[in-house]
Amino acid sequence: MGPCRGALHPLSLLVQAAALALALAQGTLPAFLPCELQPHGLVNCNWLFLKSVPRFSAAAPRGNVTSLSLYSNRIHHLHDYDFVHFVHLRRLNLKWNCPPASLSPMHFPCHMTIEPNTFLAVPTLEDLNLSYNSITTVPALPSSLVSLSLSRTNILVLDPATLAGLYALRFLFLDGNCYYKNPCQQALQVAPGALLGLGNLTHLSLKYNNLTVVPRGLPPSLEYLLLSYNHIITLAPEDLANLTALRVLDVGGNCRRCDHARNPCRECPKGFPQLHPNTFGHLSHLEGLVLRDSSLYSLDPRWFHGLGNLMVLDLSENFLYDCITKTKAFYGLARLRRLNLSFNYHKKVSFAHLHLASSFGSLLSLQELDIHGIFFRSLSKTTLQSLAHLPMLQRLHLQLNFISQAQLSIFGAFPGLRYVDLSDNRISGAAEPAAATGEVEADCGERVWPQSRDLALGPLGTPGSEAFMPSCRTLNFTLDLSRNNLVTVQPEMFVRLARLQCLGLSHNSISQAVNGSQFVPLSNLRVLDLSHNKLDLYHGRSFTELPRLEALDLSYNSQPFSMRGVGHNLSFVAQLPALRYLSLAHNGIHSRVSQQLRSASLRALDFSGNTLSQMWAEGDLYLRFFQGLRSLVQLDLSQNRLHTLLPRNLDNLPKSLRLLRLRDNYLAFFNWSSLALLPKLEALDLAGNQLKALSNGSLPNGTQLQRLDLSGNSIGFVVPSFFALAVRLRELNLSANALKTVEPSWFGSLAGALKVLDVTANPLHCACGATFVDFLLEVQAAVPGLPSRVKCGSPGQLQGRSIFAQDLRLCLDEALSWVCFSLSLLAVALSLAVPMLHQLCGWDLWYCFHLCLAWLPRRGRRRGVDALAYDAFVVFDKAQSSVADWVYNELRVQLEERRGRRALRLCLEERDWVPGKTLFENLWASVYSSRKTLFVLARTDRVSGLLRASFLLAQQRLLEDRKDVVVLVILCPDAHRSRYVRLRQRLCRQSVLLWPHQPSGQRSFWAQLGTALTRDNRHFYNQNFCRGPTTA
């Protein structure tokens, strides 16, 4: 809505730019538009599709900026002056602005140009990230640089002059400059001694560069050297000469095992890799060594001589399946803490048993052992016999080995063991002790091996989508048996596992009826995960053998609940004295269950994904289903197909509730006053429902509500002061709704206390003079993503753009734009017409001018009537509450508050009538002091009382003044309209308006009503029938 569109378009752009600059200079808008200032001096400009570095205002506190992130934009040219004003800039991120064509999503060619002094102008710069940019040379860099990332670029040559002068540099990343995703004609060329001048360099990463040898002349200060996934197939002591300070060396993936590769792979030549016995002997400070994916068939003990400080050794994805059972290479690694031997399987072979070599017993400091993907079918005492005396062993990974027989009791002999992962196997029940035979069984055909990245499973308690269940990471002993073939659970499985505290049995096929005897040996169990099974909850003593059970996950056990006619008993919950967390989510519970849950200890219940709507529809049968949970603090009722939530439903929830989730239901109405029935409620989640307005009341006074999530609804209207009484409210999420504005009247004095006010993803109407801009600027510290993620939904030219694309407070409105255009057009027309008319008919014009001059005084006297006080007198039946509500909350708001400068003056009985005057005096004054008389009718068949009297006065005014002032608004159009209405529709259609049923037609209705109230009715009369009333 720029001023004076069309003819003055260049002028409008100038006015807008000047207005925006003025606003920025005054400090009223966010200082770093279009970017966002975040804590710790970070200016975030990520994902803004910028084509150049923003020119921030001189008034912005650029001196306080220490970090600038321009990640994932479209900046292809960096100038000398781009960063000169950031005098304290320390970190600069320019990643993903102009990626090489092969890395670009659309494979578009791109080249980034960096002028010579771009970074030299920032002498304080310490961290620079230029990754994923199409640059071929290293730009000039300041000597203050500490960390430099040039990964996934087109830099293929490093020589001594390239990084000269970077004496403070400690971290250098040059990964992926020449590999299958970023192909080149040759390998990365590192000249001998090219990095030798970097005396403080400690971290060097050259992964994925097609290197065939270790670069010569590396600085002796290096502590981390990463050379994985190149083509270095020989290693000798001279390759790592002088690197005595190395702590981590990664040379994995240089001679790959291609039958387990997840990306393009070059087969390792026969007889390689070749590692000299003394390759690592001089690296006495080495703590981490990675030899994964290196096609190793054996381990030479001499490789590890001198590595007394080695703590982490990764030997995964090799061919060490035989070596594991007899190697002596581990005897000297007394400090080793983590050992990874995963996916050292024999192609097409699965072992019947596995014996770990005796040298494993010398790893006295070993804390974590990963042997998943070896493929052996039986786990017995002899399998882990070598580990029995390791006092520090805490974590053991045995997943994805196709184990079908497992003696779980063997883990009772490991007093320090904290986590055992046996997931993704084929365990079907308890196993008898078996002697090891060492035999192998050949598979019948090729096996498709899963990728290693999908197998690095974390602990059982890794937080997921649901935050109700506690994590197992802090517990002393966790056993994960998820994704196996268990059909039943037998107490014999858990013999000698009394100290087990967390047990995962999810994603099995357990279909038995638990009766209180399945977990008898697990007297200390605190967390039990039985999700994604087929448990039959019939017995009232289920799980009662677990006296210390605190968390029980029974989610996704829907099959028994879907069986028609089968009952389910949940009374066992009352008999678990320590139970605090219970999940019954996604079970489709709808009928034939216990009428009430009872527990004195339960604090969190996840009941999402059920059909509570059907349960509450059964009269009072399940009305008190949750009432017996006296200590309940958190309750999740999401995805329960709720269409309504009656006050009695909330009244029968536990009064101790602090968090209530009602996400993703079908709620189109919510009784806000009923929140008073939950006196301790602090957080309410109503996201993903079908609320269209916040108009029925307001948040009750005295509520303890602190967090309210209303995102993902269709809210388009909020009544004033809706949130004002919730004085403790601090976080409000209104994102992804249909709001066209955000009014300060919604919040009252609460606005300043809000810590989070999320209004992103709303179609805000960015009209000139939009009041929400000033309000959002006042509370901008609480609005996440205000500069870039709060966007306009209309008008069309601003749709999808930031609300600060132009300053909506200083731009001119549309009416003034037309005035500017009309005046300029008139000036041009007069400058052309006046000389021409003067030349052709000057005397005639002089005569007409004086004739009009003599005629004007009479017209002036005739029009010299006092200006009317109101634009319209609104008449309606106050007895009809729905009509009165529409007049006060819709009609008045639209015509008086939302029209800006074109606001109309309405005369309302209860607001504008003068006390002390008679009814008739006020009525007469209202009709004769208003330009129009607006009748708001619910129906047209019966009109009486004040409506009838007002109509007669309006008709009298028609007879006396010859002015038709009647405008009809019919809220509920019916087929049987009065004859007067039908006649008036014939003669003067624009003065009879019908309230549209569809919200999409309301905008047109208000426009028509504004026209009907501001123009004379005689212009609306149908000329085929009459000419309308005329003045004398």
Swiss-Prot record:
Membrane topology: Single-pass type I membrane protein
Predominant subcellular localization, coarse grouping: endoplasmic reticulum
Positions on the Cytoplasmic side per record topology: 837-1032
A cellular-component GO term for this protein: plasma membrane
Signal sequence, renumbered to the chain: 1-25
Lipidation (S-palmitoyl cysteine): 258, 265
Post-translational modification: Activated by proteolytic cleavage of the flexible loop between repeats LRR14 and LRR15 within the ectodomain. Cleavage requires UNC93B1. Proteolytically processed by first removing the majority of the ectodomain by either asparagine endopeptidase (AEP) or a cathepsin followed by a trimming event that is solely cathepsin mediated and required for optimal receptor signaling.
GO annotation terms (biological process): canonical NF-kappaB signal transduction; defense response to virus; inflammatory response; innate immune response; positive regulation of B cell activation; positive regulation of B cell proliferation; positive regulation of immunoglobulin production; positive regulation of interferon-alpha production
All residue ranges annotated as the TIR domain in the record: 868-1013
Keyword Nucleotide-binding carried by entry: no
Entry binding sites for DNA: 47-51, 72-77, 95-109, 132, 152, 179-181, 208, 262
Alphabetic keyword roster: Cytoplasmic vesicle, Disulfide bond, Endoplasmic reticulum, Endosome, Glycoprotein, Immunity, Inflammatory response, Innate immunity, Leucine-rich repeat, Lipoprotein, Lysosome, Membrane, Palmitate, Receptor, Repeat, Signal, Transmembrane, Transmembrane helix
Glycosylation sites: 64, 129, 200, 210, 242, 340, 476, 515, 569, 671, 696, 701, 733
Extracellular topological intervals: 26-815
Subunit structure of this chain's protein: Monomer and homodimer. Exists as a monomer in the absence of unmethylated cytidine-phosphate-guanosine (CpG) ligand. Proteolytic processing of an insertion loop (Z-loop) is required for homodimerization upon binding to the unmethylated CpG ligand leading to its activation. Interacts with MYD88 via their respective TIR domains. Interacts with BTK. Interacts (via transmembrane domain) with UNC93B1. Interacts with CD300LH; the interaction may promote full activation of TLR9-triggered innate responses.
Function: Key component of innate and adaptive immunity. TLRs (Toll-like receptors) control host immune response against pathogens through recognition of molecular patterns specific to microorganisms. TLR9 is a nucleotide-sensing TLR which is activated by unmethylated cytidine-phosphate-guanosine (CpG) dinucleotides. Acts via MYD88 and TRAF6, leading to NF-kappa-B activation, cytokine secretion and the inflammatory response. Upon CpG stimulation, induces B-cell proliferation, activation, survival and antibody production.
Name of the protein in question: Toll-like receptor 9
Species for this entry: Canis lupus familiaris
Taxonomic path: Eukaryota, Metazoa, Chordata, Craniata, Vertebrata
Name of encoding gene: TLR9
